């Protein structure tokens, strides 16, 4: 076998050989190619190792066969050679010995041994070649690993740092290499042990060869002695010579195959024998040489094994190195292990349940053993009773013979006959009890099988859940990576904007200084004007005084007229203050300017300390706090003391994904709002710097207003979210003073007017989206909807009226996260990578901004933004899901146009699907069109629903929703209002005859007729298992119905196979009982409230037996005087629908189920009389004229259930267009039904002969 050398792996590209630094993606691709090559090489090595092991096992088997043949030949040789020698000596001396052996046969056997030895040598050489090949492969693999050790270690660390969610393929490769080396080490030890055994056998063979050589030497000596005797016996008698000749002739006849023996020459025979002995000696010597060669080769094999062991030691050293790397990688694997531990804890809990089930099984087996012993005792008693019966019969025959003469014996015989009848009754009771015990035994066995099936299903669900969790985690990791890149890009852009805003601020400060100097010049000019007016005459004095009053008034109202009017800032009046001098105005200007400088310095500190120039720092801090709470809450959910069910885990994963999506959406919106804010700042700076100077030259009072406006702009423009003003009494007036007289460009004013109109809109469900997509609504930006008026009184009024807008528009300054704070308590996600990245910076910023955080906390309290508890969070999620369904109802969307969250809410709220199915649908189904297009096999493959009844449930629900939400549904299948959803008012119209029709619009999720159980889950699988089945007297099937999620919609679609296989309803009577229960629901149009109302009405009266439950039937049996037999129909399937609708179910069937003995005629007569009375008073069944014992159904039953409904499809007008083939619906038609109650008749009158499709969920 040739030694195949593995091809080398191209580890480095030409770029890397030249030493150039390649990009991260190229190195990753090369490394992945390298790992793929190593994995392929590992597979090849495993294949060669497997083949080598097989060949080694074959060689060992062959070696054992050769050893066995050699031992047998050796024994034959040892046993044959002495006899041959003795026979030869006897023949030569003329004695009457045995015939000489067949040396030709020995030579043939010797040749066969030689050929077998050659074959074994070839096999040994092949094994050596294979072992050499394996050693070369291992050396090649070791070279590869040592060559790429550094790159492997770096990439393992890099991969683990990037994706902490799972274990990389490199770790798996290292583990595989370690297992391969350990396997080769164990194999080498096995080979060494076998070599030691073979060497021991070779030494034993050498000893045997030495003994054989000694025997050959002794034979030679005997031959020499025989030759001497032959020389001395030449003068023997002729008769002895003739006998020798005959012996020689015999030898010649036997050795004729050699062709070298002369029958007349004894010496030639001896020579021949000597030659044969020499040949055999030569062959034995060759055998010995070959054995020595074999021993030398075995030594070589041992040396090779030693080298292989050294190689294995080297590989073990490499493995230790890799194990160190693996330990480093295992530190990153702890997160996954924690989640695995939670799953393991759940598995342990399931295992504990299985152990408890096993214990219960053992108890049941012990009880069964006891019952079997009781049964044996009862059988023995039965035999004794039978023997006594036979003896009694014999005695009866004897007494019958004596009956004519002994009349007294007849009385005694009658007594004995009565005793025998009693014994027979007891025997019948015992047989019935035995049958009952056998039935219980079968039920226990079935329960055991069901428990095992449930355990298997739990394992499958756990596996699916772990797969879904892994897939969701990988997807969230990818989204977080993209999120991080986009956030970093936004950071760079915002840093550029901050620098530009710094430049704008410097320009503003310069313009402010210029305006101060201009104000000083204006005051000088005014003082000169005053002097000139004093010098002028008395004729011009009134006009000048008026102008002075006007200018001073303008000056007052432009700067500080509203600063101290905090008490009446909510009114539309402007209260004038006493006049102040020019020094008062100058005192106010530094205040405003210092306020702007203070704000700007604080903003600089925030930007430098945080290096995180977001506009929504408060949002990030709030999200950080919320995320911190959510992390601990999610860890509580994962802990064993918290909620460990699958639904909570799926809900938590969905919250994490929603939080990630929300953060991505917020980043995009912040980017857009940042761009809009930059344009706004540029426009403001340009308008203030250009218009302010012109206004200063023309109107002196207006220049001061412009300065105040610029200072207010400077105080409100920092991008940090912590610049929210404190809610003090002076803040509204000061805010109006700063904001009320500002001029904006015309296009920006129009944009602000649009924002104000949008904010005043009453659609609360879209408010947050509009606020986030539009620029942030600061108080100044929202209120500034007017240009500079001619009268400052009107300006003040407009500012005051604008200040009375809702608090949501006036509480923040430049805080774009104010709207996102509205959404903060709605959904709390996990702490994202952005929160981790900037958490420390925000903490450093919190130390300096504690005062601003207090005001923000006050604003949050005023807006109701407190942290919600766990129950409130669940209620909010539930309300959000109801709102999704309500929105779909309000828009009238077909099912194909529903989005993914609406479909998931529909599955969870209305359908009641398990949490793992909901999680799988959330991951795989993104719209109603995808859900409605899924076939049965796709539902099983994509969503993982393996139970056929679960698939039936989902398929029927999808078909129903598609047909109900279809815009092409005919009017006959709709409600009187023409809407496919029945409103609350229409429901009242259907149930209350005195009420008139109300509005068509209503809440779809509150009270629809056909979907009332859909919205509230009234007739879902919980109701079927917990209430309906016990009311039928079939509570033993509750667990199966609950496992299969059987709801009212599925009842009419269950086949016999489903009942027998999936629901374990093997008893035909129980299936019949279930069928009549379904018929009862059909007659009530699947109306649970009507069913409960009629049951409540017939609780204490013998009427309306159709709706009687099993408990009501038991109470009726107790009331008629059969209390001792009443409990026998528990779990028997006897209920009112069976009595009222099954014409084959008569009093004898009920007596059999009640286990009333046939001898108890009195109880049976009571039952017959009361049963007939029950049928006459509470059902539509009547006694037939021909036979009093048989009953028949009334004509109403035959009309209400036509023959074609027996096959499972009830056709009705208007339903064939919207419903698929085989989809069964019930009809409620005024012409085809006669309802007994007034409510039902009034409902039919208001339906106007239209059909209402009713199904539950």
Swiss-Prot record:
The modification Phosphoserine is found at residues 236, 239, 687, 689, 817, 820. Alters PTPRF cellular localization and induces PTPRF clustering. May regulate the disassembly of focal adhesions. May localize receptor-like tyrosine phosphatases type 2A at specific sites on the plasma membrane, possibly regulating their interaction with the extracellular environment and their association with substrates. In neuronal cells, is a scaffolding protein in the dendritic spines which acts as immobile postsynaptic post able to recruit KIF1A-driven dense core vesicles to dendritic spines. The lineage of its organism: Eukaryota, Metazoa, Chordata, Craniata, Vertebrata. It is found in: Cytoplasm; Cell surface; Cell projection, Dendritic spine. Residues 16-26, 709-725 have a biased composition (Low complexity). This is Liprin-alpha-2. Pfam families: SAM_1, SAM_2. Keywords: Cell projection, Coiled coil, Cytoplasm, Phosphoprotein, Repeat, Synapse.
């Amino acid at each position: 076998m040739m030694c195949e050398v593995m091809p080398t792996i191209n580890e480095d590209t030409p770029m890397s050989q030249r030493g150039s630094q390649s990009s991260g993606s190229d190195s990753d691709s090369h490394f992945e190619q390298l790992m793929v090559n190593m994995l392929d090489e590992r597979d090849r090595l495993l294949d060669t190792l497997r083949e080598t092991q097989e060949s080694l096992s074959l060689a060992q088997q062959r070696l054992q066969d050769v050893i066995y043949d050699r031992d047998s030949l050796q024994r034959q040789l040892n046993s044959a050679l002495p006899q041959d020698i003795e026979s030869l000596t006897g023949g030569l001396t003329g004695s009457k010995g045995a015939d000489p052996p067949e040396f030709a046969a020995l030579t043939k056997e010797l040749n066969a041994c030689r050929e077998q030895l050659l074959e074994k040598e070839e096999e040994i050489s092949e094994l050596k070649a294979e072992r050499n090949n394996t050693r070369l492969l291992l050396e090649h693999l070791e070279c590869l690993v040592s060559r790429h050790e550094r790159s492997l270690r770096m990439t393992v660390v890099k991969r683990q740092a990037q994706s902490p969610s799972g274990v990389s393929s490199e770790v798996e490769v290292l583990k595989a290499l370690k297992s391969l080396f350990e396997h080769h080490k164990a194999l080498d030890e096995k080979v060494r042990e076998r070599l030691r055994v073979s060497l021991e056998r070779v030494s034993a063979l050498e000893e045997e060869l030495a003994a054989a050589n000694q025997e050959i030497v002794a034979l030679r000596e005997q031959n020499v002695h025989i030759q001497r005797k032959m020389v001395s016996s030449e003068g023997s008698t002729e008769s002895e010579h003739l006998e020798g000749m005959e012996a020689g002739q015999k030898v010649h006849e036997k050795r004729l195959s050699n062709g070298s023996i002369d029958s007349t020459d004894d010496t030639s025979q001896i020579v021949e024998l000597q030659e044969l002995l020499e040949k055999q000696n030569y062959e034995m010597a060759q055998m010995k040489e070959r054995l020595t060669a074999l021993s030398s080769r075995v030594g070589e094999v041992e040396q090779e094994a030693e080298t292989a062991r050294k190689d294995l030691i080297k590989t073990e050293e490499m493995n230790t190195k890799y194990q160190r790397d693996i330990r480093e990688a295992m530190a990153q694997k702890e997160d996954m292990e924690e989640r695995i531990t939670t799953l393991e804890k759940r598995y342990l809990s399931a295992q504990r349940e299985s152990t408890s089930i096993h214990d219960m099984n053992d108890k049941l087996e012990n009880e069964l053993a006891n019952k079997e012993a009781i049964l044996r005792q009862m059988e023995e008693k039965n035999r004794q009773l039978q023997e006594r019966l036979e003896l009694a019969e014999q005695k009866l025959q004897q007494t019958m013979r004596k009956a004519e003469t002994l009349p007294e014996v007849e009385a005694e015989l009658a007594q004995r006959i009565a005793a025998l009848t009693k014994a027979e009754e007891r025997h019948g009771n015992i047989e019935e009890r035995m049958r009952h015990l056998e039935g219980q035994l079968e039920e226990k066995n079935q329960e055991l099988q069901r428990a095992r099936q449930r355990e298997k299903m739990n394992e499958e669900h756990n596996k699916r859940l772990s797969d879904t969790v892994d897939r969701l985690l990988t997807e969230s990791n990818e989204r977080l990576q993209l999120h991080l890149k986009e956030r970093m890009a936004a950071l760079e852009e915002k840093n550029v904007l901050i620098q530009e805003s710094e430049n704008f601020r410097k320009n503003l400060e310069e313009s402010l200084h210029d305006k101060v100097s201009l104000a000083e010049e204006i005051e000088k000019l005014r003082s000169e004007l005053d002097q000139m007016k004093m010098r002028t005459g008395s004729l011009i004095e009134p006009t000048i005084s008026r102008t002075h009053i006007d200018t001073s008034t303008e000056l007052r109202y432009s700067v500080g007229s509203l600063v101290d009017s905090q008490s009446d800032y909510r009114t539309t009046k402007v209260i004038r203050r006493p006049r102040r001098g020019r020094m008062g105005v100058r005192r106010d200007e530094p205040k405003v300017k210092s306020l702007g400088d203070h704000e700007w310095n604080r903003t600089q500190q925030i930007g430098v300390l945080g290096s995180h120039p977001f506009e929504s720092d408060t949002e990030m801090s709030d999200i950080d706090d919320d995320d911190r709470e959510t992390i601990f809450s999610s860890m509580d959910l994962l802990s064993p003391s918290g909620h460990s069910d699958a639904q909570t885990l799926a809900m938590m994963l969905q919250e994490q994904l929603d939080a990630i999506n929300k953060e991505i959406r917020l980043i995009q919106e912040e980017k857009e709002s940042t761009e809009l804010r930059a344009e706004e700042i540029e426009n403001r700076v340009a308008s203030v710097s250009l218009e302010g100077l012109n206004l200063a030259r023309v109107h002196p009072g207006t220049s001061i207003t412009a300065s105040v406006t610029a200072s207010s702009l400077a105080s409100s423009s920092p991008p940090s979210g912590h610049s929210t003003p404190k809610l003090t009494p002076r803040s509204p007036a000061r805010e109006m003073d700063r904001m009320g007289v500002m001029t904006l460009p015309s296009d920006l004013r129009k944009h602000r007017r649009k924002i104000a109109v949008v904010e005043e809109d009453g659609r609360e469900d879209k408010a947050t989206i509009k606020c986030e997509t539009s620029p942030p609504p600061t108080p100044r930006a929202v209120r500034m909807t007017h240009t500079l008026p001619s009268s400052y009184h009107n300006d003040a009024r407009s500012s005051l009226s604008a200040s009375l807008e809702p608090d949501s528009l006036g509480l923040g300054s430049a805080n774009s996260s104010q709207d996102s704070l509205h959404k903060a308590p709605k959904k709390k996600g996990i702490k994202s990578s952005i929160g981790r990245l900037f958490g420390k910076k925000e903490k450093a910023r919190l130390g300096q901004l504690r005062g601003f955080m207090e005001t923000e906390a006050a604003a949050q309290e005023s807006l109701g933004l407190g942290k919600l508890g766990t129950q409130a969070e669940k209620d909010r999620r539930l309300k959000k899901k109801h709102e999704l369904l309500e929105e779909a109802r309000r828009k009238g969307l077909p099912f194909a146009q529903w989005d993914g969250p609406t479909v998931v809410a529909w599955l969870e709220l209305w359908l009641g699907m398990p949490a793992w199915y909901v999680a799988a649908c959330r991951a795989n189904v993104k719209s109603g069109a995808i859900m409605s297009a899924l076939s049965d096999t796709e539902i099983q493959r994509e969503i993982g629903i393996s139970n056929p009844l679960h698939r039936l449930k989902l398929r029927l629900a999808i078909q129903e929703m598609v047909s109900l939400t279809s815009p092409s549904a005919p009017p006959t299948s709709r409600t009187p209002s023409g809407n496919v959803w029945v409103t609350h008012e229409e429901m009242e119209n259907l149930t209350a005859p005195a009420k008139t029709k109300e509005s068509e619009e209503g809440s779809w999720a509150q009270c629809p007729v056909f979907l009332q159980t859909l919205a509230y889950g009234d007739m879902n699988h919980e109701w079927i298992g917990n209430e309906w089945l016990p009311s039928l007297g079939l509570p033993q099937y509750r667990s199966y119905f609950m496992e299969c999620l059987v709801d009212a919609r599925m009842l009419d679609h269950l086949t016999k196979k489903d009942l027998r296989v999936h629901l374990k309803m093997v008893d035909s009577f129980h299936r019949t009982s279930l069928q009549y229960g379904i018929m009862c629901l059909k007659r009530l149009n699947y109306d649970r409230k009507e069913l409960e109302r009629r049951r409540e009405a017939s609780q204490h009266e013998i009427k309306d037996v159709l709706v009687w439950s099993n408990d009501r039937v038991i109470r009726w049996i107790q009331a008629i005087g059969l209390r001792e037999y009443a409990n026998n129909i528990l779990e028997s399937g006897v209920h009112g629908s069976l009595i009222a609708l099954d014409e084959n179910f008569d009093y004898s069937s009920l007596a059999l189920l009640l286990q009333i003995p046939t001898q108890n005629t009195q109880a049976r007569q009571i039952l017959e009389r009361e049963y007939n009375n029950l049928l006459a008073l509470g059902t539509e069944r009547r006694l037939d004229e021909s036979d009093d014992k048989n009953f028949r159904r009334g004509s109403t039953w035959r009309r209400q259930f036509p023959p074609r409904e027996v096959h499972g499809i009830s056709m009705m007008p208007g339903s064939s267009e919207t419903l698929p083939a085989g989809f069964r619906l019930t009809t409620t038609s005024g012409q085809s039904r006669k309802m007994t109650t007034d409510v039902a008749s009034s409902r039919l009158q208001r339906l106007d002969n239209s059909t209402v499709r009713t199904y539950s969920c």
